[in-house]
């Protein structure tokens, strides 16, 4: 069970906004680039001012980014805007945004840089394995337990927690370690889904 499974409900809530944007000539690629720009600007701010209170921004930005990611996909599919460029922007933008938004954790007190870098590497590996499924079987794998939406929820909540209770940063490395294990588990599950689908064929 992952948050990805409630995506249809989230999309239905966003559909009126999608039509409003479409009527104003906003394209899916523009929404994708807006999400990337928001992530990079937030990451730069958090890196330059690595004060725990600033991480209150993280859950807000992650939620907005999640909404923008849903909107660009919906608009591409439902408004006939699917392009190869859009697919490239979507996949690269997701990975760059993830790295950018979670990299500032490295600058927090009590954070082990090696663990944060390992976690980011595992994040990239997880997305690569999801794309690998699409390359082999034609269907992208979103297997959990620690997909993009799940990461946004956990790290957003952690940003909120350390903003309110800075002393909780003593548990930073425990979270990075657990996250890395969950990401590796997710990568393995996505590779398994490739093999299972291939076997069924």
Model regions: which residues?
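Active-site His/Glu-centered metal-binding helix of metallohydrolases
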Residues: 67-75, 88, 92-96, 125-128, ...
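Basic, amphipathic juxtamembrane/active-site segments
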Residues: 74-114
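Hydrophobic alpha-helical transmembrane segments
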Residues: 1-60, 100-201
């Amino acid at each position: 069970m992952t948050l990805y499974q409630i995506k249809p409900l989230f999309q239905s809530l966003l559909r009126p906004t999608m039509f409003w944007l479409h009527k104003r000539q906003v394209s899916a690629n523009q929404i994708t680039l807006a999400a990337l720009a928001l992530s990079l600007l937030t990451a730069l701010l958090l890196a330059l001012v690595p004060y725990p209170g600033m991480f209150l921004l993280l859950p807000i930005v992650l939620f907005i980014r999640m909404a923008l990611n849903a909107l660009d996909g919906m608009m591409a599919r439902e408004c006939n805007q699917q392009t190869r460029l859009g697919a490239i922007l979507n996949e690269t933008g997701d990975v760059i945004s993830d790295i950018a938004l979670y990299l500032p954790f490295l600058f927090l007190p009590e954070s082990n840089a090696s663990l944060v870098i390992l976690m980011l590497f595992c994040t990239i590996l997880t997305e690569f394995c999801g794309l690998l499924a699409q390359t082999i079987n034609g269907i992208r794998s979103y297997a959990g337990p620690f997909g993009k939406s799940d990461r946004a929820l956990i790290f957003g909540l952690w940003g909120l927690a350390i903003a309110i209770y800075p002393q909780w940063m003593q548990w930073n490395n425990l979270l990075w370690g657990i996250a890395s294990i969950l990401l590796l588990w997710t990568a393995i599950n996505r590779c398994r889904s490739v093999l299972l689908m291939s076997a069924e064929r």
